[in-house]
Curated annotation (Swiss-Prot), chain B:
Pathway(s) served: Lipid metabolism; fatty acid biosynthesis
Entry similarity comment: Belongs to the acyl carrier protein (ACP) family.
Protein species of origin: Gluconacetobacter diazotrophicus (strain ATCC 49037 / DSM 5601 / CCUG 37298 / CIP 103539 / LMG 7603 / PAl5)
Record's function text: Carrier of the growing fatty acid chain in fatty acid biosynthesis.
GO cellular component: cytosol; membrane
Pfam families linked to this entry: PP-binding
Protein name per UniProt: Acyl carrier protein
Post-translational changes noted in the entry: 4'-phosphopantetheine is transferred from CoA to a specific serine of apo-ACP by AcpS. This modification is essential for activity because fatty acids are bound in thioester linkage to the sulfhydryl of the prosthetic group.
Keyword line: Cytoplasm, Fatty acid biosynthesis, Fatty acid metabolism, Lipid biosynthesis, Lipid metabolism, Phosphopantetheine, Phosphoprotein
Biological process according to GO: lipid A biosynthetic process
Carrier domain location: 2-77
Amino acid sequence: MGIVSPLGLGLEHNWSRLIAGESGIGRIASFDPSDLPAHVAGEVPAGPTEAGCLTLSDWVPVKDQKKMDRFIHLGLVAATEAVEDSGWKPESEEDRCRTGVMIGSGIGGLQTIYDASVTVHEGRARRLSPFFIPSALINLVSGHVSIKYGFKGPNHSVVTACASGVHAIGDASRLIMLGDADVMVAGGAEAAVCPLGIAGFSSARALSTAFNAEPEKASRPWDRDRDGFVMGEGAGIVVLEEYEHAKARGAKIYGEIIGYGMSGDAYHITAPAEGHEGAYRAMQAAVRSAGIAPSDIGYVNAHGTSTMADDLELQAVERLFGDAASQVAMSSTKSAIGHLLGAAGAVEAIFSILAIRDNVAPPTLNLDNPSTESAIDRVAHEAQRRKIDIALSNSFGFGGTNASIIVRGV
Amino acid sequence: MSEIADKVKKIVVEHLGVEESKVTPEASFIDDLGADSLDTVELVMAFEEAFSVEIPEDAAEKIATVKDAIDYIEKQKAA
């Protein structure tokens, strides 16, 4: 597994900072946000690799960097960590053909598209880089990962806004179940913290603007003072492998994907339906495919974006768990890293697996005054030690698309 | 070496990320300097920009080596 996020570089570095209750949110540093309503975001810290920060040239050769948008850079960083961690180095042509890639993104190369638009607008269309299109295309993370490692199996991608990461992992696991591949590198990557991205989500009234002076307090899922999400950037990548295949080669196995459910709201382009019934149906489908009871789930990593929709998700989760609601912990790790859009679901699925490994529920930061009371423990402020055998992670996207994934320790 | 040759060499080093010593006049962009077809398109654009010249597509296709580029630009500049 591999992560690059506003908490930094690397799986264990991210996890230890998350459990310690640290925040990766700050004032936007990559450009001057003064003209925009929202001034805060979660950006991947630049700096030395050994300090858990990103030095891009350690991961992507300088001459290749300009051929890819930043979301591809971040995807390659996390994919490199994940592939190395998995120890999977297919030597034979057959093994390479049985290894695929499915990495999604919600937005793709937004800054690249912006820059190219300016070039064309200035009447310099003939000066447009030949790398513009392959730099911006969402499936090019999968493309670059396959080229880097020689993975010749299914090469696919997912675009379902903020549900892309979960859909990619879920769909990739289904490809393995269907026999299309033995190994799939899957996840999501996003880098939309740029003027166009911030302006666009601001215009949709989706971003927090009330905490510009106190960035670390801006992402506050379920808190009564929340006023929108905080955008984050990064990538989360996992290596999925057919169980017997992984066992046979003595692979390090973090966990098993046991359930996956999807649904559509058929309601509104950005708002969830009443009671988040689409989320309920996605979770229900995941529980059904896992063949478990909701009460078997010890931890829920919520979509919980720090918007009004948080309480609707809460209602849907309460409905799913019924009388077992008081037994489950649910937190939103977006409180620490912001909303990584198309990478969110992948990073959060990884956090869910680590929650099982270490029997610890990561905290929901800034949950000072819940807007709604609930029997569900939302792990306010501090991580909690508790027995977690099975975890569920939710992701919902614009367009009314919902995905839930259920993981178990091995 | 001419001023044009110096500048061409610099652009090649920068765009292809290769050692300066490898950028000899005879070096082929694709065979010796690791460029692909998209790299060569970008390289020609960089020459056009840097020397304020137009390099039409049929001429660009014939620019395979560092010397080809230098000769073409020198000819344009002399005209």
